[in-house]
Design a protein with these regions (language model features):
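Conserved donor nucleotide-binding strand/loop of the catalytic core
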Residues: 29, 44-73
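Catalytic-site signature of metal-activated, phosphate-bearing donor transferases
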Residues: 64-71, 89-270
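Cell-envelope/extracellular polymer assembly enzymes that use nucleotide-activated donors
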Residues: 3-5
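A conserved acidic beta->alpha catalytic loop
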Residues: 23, 33-45, 59, 83
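Short aromatic/hydrophobic "clamp" motif used to bind/position activated sugar donors
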Residues: 79
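Juxtamembrane C-terminal module of membrane proteins
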Residues: 265-286
Length: 286
């Protein structure tokens, strides 16, 4: 019988992490918790009630930058990546081990609908690839590489992966978008984009360079930004059924297109040798 390892990468999540851990207890074979840098609240004390497999990793500010370390520590081939503000629905808890027995499956996606306070505002969108085989996945330790690229069959399930942040808003509000996406995340990704490929840790990645989109953005940041922005806008609208899910999909398409415009300009600014924090001060975009 194939078993499942689940891991959480957290940063001072004492208000949320116990709910996530409770949903895993008695369901998966192994629970691992990793903290992004030193912990200043009770996150790790809470985690110790559920597992002794706890690690404190160097502070990097993005969970994606710790995924390879977490995957390597998991003992089972099947891994489940859970955020501290997520938890398994009852239906998913009952079926997760059954999913692991499918020999043809390499990964599973789950419904991850947006919520506003206590109500869902989408039904079947977005979806999240949270469960996958270590032997079939590949990663680059790169901001934004939050989901694995997997070989083989990915099965889109109807099971619900609950996402309920402490603020009660399970999607990027405008203020969050400006602060995180256009601020910290956008600037971070721009800096990483210009780093040499050899400086990145990889996991089962069979190429000798970044994906083509990243290479184009590195070389032609300003020219490519509008193109990537338009493509992302159209892809989200048509791939994620805007007619069924409504305005949240449209809003996400607009935000993503804006993000790609800013990202291209951030890369351009850095290539000129200018300081991003002077061009875009923290009190404006971060």
């Amino acid at each position: 019988m194939e078993k499942v390892s689940a891991f959480i990468i957290a940063y001072n999540e004492e208000k949320l992490i116990e709910r996530a851990l409770k949903s895993l207890k008695g369901v998966v074979d192994e629970i691992l918790v990793f903290h992004d840098g030193p912990c200043s609240d009770k996150t790790l004390d809470i985690a110790k009630k559920y597992t002794n497999k706890i690690g404190i990793l160097p502070r990097k500010g993005r969970a994606a930058l710790h995924l390879i370390a977490a995957i390597k520590k998991a003992k089972n081939d099947w891994v489940f990546k859970l955020d501290a503000d997520e938890f398994l629905s009852e239906e998913l808890k009952k079926n997760i081990n059954k999913l692991a027995q499918d020999k043809e499956a390499s990964a599973y996606t789950f419904r991850w609908p947006w919520r506003l306070n206590d109500e869902y505002i989408t039904k079947d969108w977005p979806i999240k690839k949270a469960m996958f085989r270590k032997s079939k996945c590949s990663f680059i330790e790169y901001p934004g590489w939050d989901e694995p690229r997997t070989l083989g069959k990915t099965i889109n399930t109807k099971y619900l992966l609950e996402h309920r942040p402490n603020k009660g808003i399970a999607y990027n509000s405008l203020s969050s978008f400006i602060e995180k996406a256009l601020g910290r995340y956008g600037k971070s990704q721009a800096r990483y984009t210009l780093m040499p490929f050899s400086s990145f840790e990889t996991y089962q990645y069979d190429k000798k360079d970044f994906p083509i989109i990243t290479r184009i953005r590195r070389k032609f940041p300003l020219v490519s930004a509008p193109l990537f922005s338009i493509v992302a806008f159209g892809k989200i609208l048509f791939k994620h059924n805007v007619l069924r899910e409504g305005s949240p999909v449209l809003v996400e398409a607009v935000k993503t297109s804006i993000y790609y415009l800013f990202l291209g300009y951030y890369v351009h600014v850095l290539k000129q040798g200018r300081n991003l924090e002077k061009v875009f001060p923290k009190n404006k975009l971060n």
